[in-house]
UniProtKB/Swiss-Prot annotation:
Compositionally biased residues, Polar residues: 390-416
Gene for this chain: cst-1
Site features described as Cleavage, chain residue numbers: D333, G334
Gene3D superfamilies noted in UniProt: p53-like tetramerisation domain, Transferase(Phosphotransferase) domain 1
Tissue-by-tissue expression: Widely expressed in epidermal cells.
Protein known as: Serine/threonine-protein kinase cst-1
GO terms under cellular component: cytoplasm
Gene Ontology terms describing biological process: determination of adult lifespan; intracellular signal transduction; muscle cell development; negative regulation of canonical Wnt signaling pathway; peptidyl-serine phosphorylation; positive regulation of apoptotic process; protein tetramerization; regulation of MAPK cascade
Function: Serine/threonine-protein kinase which extends lifespan and delays tissue aging, probably by activating daf-16.
UniProt PTM: Proteolytically cleaved by caspase-3 during apoptosis which results in kinase activation. Phosphorylated.
Cysteine pairs bridged by disulfides in the record: none
One function term, GO molecular function aspect: ATP binding
Domain SARAH: 446-493
Domain of life (superkingdom): Eukaryota
C-alpha cells in the first residue's frame, strides 16, 4: 500500500532537487568510459569509496566499489530499495555497474563527509544547536523512509552525511550497507552494537521504532563524541543494553531541558511507547533548530581544521557498521503494515537481465556472484525478485524481521530418547563439557544441553558472566602489552626530532 496522500505530497515536496541522471547509453558502457575516478574517499570492510566525475556533464559523484562474492539476489533486492528513495534527506542512488568481480554503486556525492568526519576534523563534539539542526534533517529522512515502511537499522553519526549546502542526509542503508555486513562476517569482524535498540539485540521482533532508539544514541554520540557504553567491550554492551535503564548524558545539567527531554523520548525501552519520527519532528528541541547556516559554518570550521591538521574531509568509509544478525538485510521493504511480509512470487534467472535494466545496473554479471539455486551443471536457477520472502515450503526464512529466541534450535517431533542417543547422557567432567560445548559452537548442534539438569544449566549460565569478565581483562592485558612498546618507540622518535 502506498503512503497516504499527505505523506505522498510531503515526499514530493521534499524530493531530491538533484536533476542528474544516468541514461541507458551510459549504463551500457564500461564505467571507466563514463566516469573519471579522481580520488579515494575511504575504505572499509566492504570495499572502497571514490570521488568521481561524470565525463559528459562534469557532475561530481561518489562511487562505491564492492566485491561481489555474495548473494546476487540480495544485491538486486537492496538496489531496488535504494532506487525507490527520492528525498533530499536521503543520499540519492543513480545506478550500478558490474565491472569484473566488483559492483560499482554510483551515488550522490556529499562533499562535507559524515558527522563523524566533522567531529574528527574539529576534534570536538557538536554544539547543541548544531545537533538540533542535524537531527531535524535526519528525522525528515527517517519520516520519509518510515512512510515507505522501510527501516534504516544503522543510524549513527558515521551514516549521516552532509552536502556543502549544509543538508544532512541518511546513507548506507541500501546495498552497500548489506554488503558491509556480509563482508564483515566473512572477515570475522564484529561490528559495534552500541546504537542497537534493545528489541533488536533480544531478537523479539522490531519495527521502525528501532531507528528512533538509534537516533537517540546518535544524539548522545554527537553531544559527547561517542555513544554510551563505548568504553566497554562490545560483547558486554550486548548484555547491558537490554537489561540496564536507558542511557542518558554523562552530565545532563550541561544540556537544555528540551534536549534532555528529546533524548528521553527516543530512549524508551518499550518500542510501542517511543514516539514516531513524525511526532519527534514536532518536539520543541527540533522545531527550534536553526537553519542550514549553522551547518555551513560547522562545515567551514571542519574544513579549515582539516587543512591545518592535514586530515582530508571525505565521506565516511562506514567500516564501523552496527552488529547485525546473520541473514538480515540493512533495510526492510514492505507493504501495508509496519511489520511486513513480502509478496510470494518468483522469477527465473533468465529474467535477471531485465531486472538489472529496470534497476539501472549495467555490465555483465560476475562469475563470482552467487545466485541461489544455481548448480554446477549449469541448470538455470530460480532467482527471487526484490522484496521476496521465502515461500511456505521454507518457513524458516519466512520472517523479514528478527524473531523470538536466540538459543539452540531443536528439531520438532524428535523423541527424548533420540536426544540421549545423539549426545552424552552426562557431562562427567568440566573438560568433557567444555570440549562438547566447543564442538557444538562449531557444528551449531546444542542438543547435548537437553541432557544436563536444570540446576546445572542455571549454574553454568551464571558462571558465564565471570568468564566473560576474565576474558575481557585478558584481552585488555594483551592489548596493553602490544600497545606499550609502540608508544615507547613513538616517544623516543619524538625526542630525537
Amino acid at each position: 500500500m502506498p503512503p497516504s496522500t499527505d505523506s505522498s505530497r510531503r515526499n514530493s515536496e521534499e524530493g531530491s532537487s538533484d536533476g542528474f541522471k544516468l541514461d541507458s547509453s551510459a549504463l551500457n558502457k564500461p564505467p571507466e568510459e563514463v566516469f573519471d575516478i579522481v580520488g579515494k574517499l575511504g575504505e572499509g570492510s566492504y570495499g572502497s569509496v571514490h570521488k568521481a566525475i561524470h565525463r559528459e556533464s562534469g557532475h561530481v559523484l561518489a562511487i562505491k566499489k564492492v566485491p561481489v562474492d555474495t548473494d546476487l539476489q540480495e544485491i538486486i533486492k537492496e538496489i531496488s530499495i535504494m532506487q525507490q528513495c527520492k528525498s533530499k534527506y536521503v543520499v540519492k542512488y543513480y545506478g550500478s555497474y558490474f565491472k569484473h568481480s566488483d559492483l560499482w554503486i554510483v551515488m550522490e556525492y556529499c562533499g562535507a563527509g559524515s558527522i563523524s568526519d566533522i567531529m574528527r576534523a574539529r576534534r570536538k563534539p557538536l554544539s547543541e544547536q548544531e545537533i538540533s539542526a542535524v537531527l531535524r534533517d535526519t528525522l525528515k529522512g527517517l519520516q520519509y523512509l518510515h512512510d515507505l515502511k522501510k527501516i534504516h537499522r544503522d543510524i549513527k553519526a558515521g551514516n549521516i552525511l552532509l552536502n556543502t549546502d549544509g543538508i544532512a542526509k541518511l546513507a548506507d542503508f541500501g546495498v552497500a550497507g548489506q554488503l558491509t555486513d556480509t563482508m564483515a562476517k566473512r572477515n570475522t569482524v564484529i561490528g559495534t552494537p552500541f546504537w542497537m535498540a534493545p528489541e533488536v539485540i533480544e531478537e523479539i521482533g522490531y519495527d521502525t521504532k528501532a531507528d528512533i532508539w538509534s537516533l537517540g544514541i546518535t544524539a548522545i554520540e554527537m553531544a559527547e563524541g561517542r555513544p554510551p557504553y563505548s568504553d566497554i567491550h562490545p560483547m558486554r554492551a550486548i548484555f547491558m543494553i537490554p537489561t540496564k535503564p536507558p542511557p542518558t548524558f554523562k552530565k545532563p545539567e550541561e544540556w537544555s531541558s528540551e534536549f534532555n527531554d528529546f533524548i528521553r523520548s527516543c530512549l524508551i525501552k518499550k518500542p510501542e511507547e517511543r514516539k514516531t519520527a513524525l511526532r519527534l519532528c514536532e518536539h520543541t528541541f527540533i522545531k527550534n533548530a536553526p537553519g542550514c547556516d549553522i551547518m555551513q559554518l560547522m562545515i567551514q570550521d571542519a574544513q579549515e581544521k582539516a587543512i591545518l591538521g592535514q586530515a582530508p574531509m571525505a565521506a565516511s568509509s562506514g567500516n564501523d557498521a552496527t552488529l547485525l544478525s546473520e541473514g538480515m538485510s540493512t533495510m526492510i521493504d514492505g507493504g501495508e503494515s509496519t511489520l511486513v511480509q513480502h509478496k510470494d512470487n518468483y522469477v527465473t534467472a533468465q529474467s535477471l537481465r531485465s531486472q538489472m535494466e529496470s534497476l539501472r545496473i549495467g555490465g555483465e554479471i560476475p562469475k563470482s556472484a552467487y545466485i541461489p539455486g544455481s548448480s554446477k551443471n549449469g541448470n538455470s536457477p530460480r532467482v527471487q525478485p526484490p522484496g521476496h520472502t521465502a515461500s511456505a515450503s521454507d518457513p524458516s526464512k519466512n520472517q523479514p524481521f528478527a524473531q523470538d529466541g536466540t538459543g539452540p534450535n531443536f528439531q520438532l517431533g524428535t523423541s527424548e530418547s533420540s536426544y540421549k542417543d545423539a549426545s552424552y547422557n552426562m557431562m562427567n567432567t568440566e573438560a568433557e563439557y567444555e570440549n562438547r560445548f566447543q564442538r557444538a559452537v562449531v557444528d551449531g548442534d546444542f542438543e547435548f544441553l537437553r541432557n544436563i539438569t536444570l540446576d546445572e544449566l542455571i549454574r553454568r549460565k551464571e558462571s558465564l558472566d565471570s568468564e566473560m569478565e576474565e576474558e575481557i581483562r585478558e584481552l585488555q592485558r594483551r592489548y596493553k602489552t602490544k600497545r606499550q612498546p609502540i608508544l615507547d618507540v613513538i616517544e623516543i622518535k619524538k625526542r630525537l626530532q
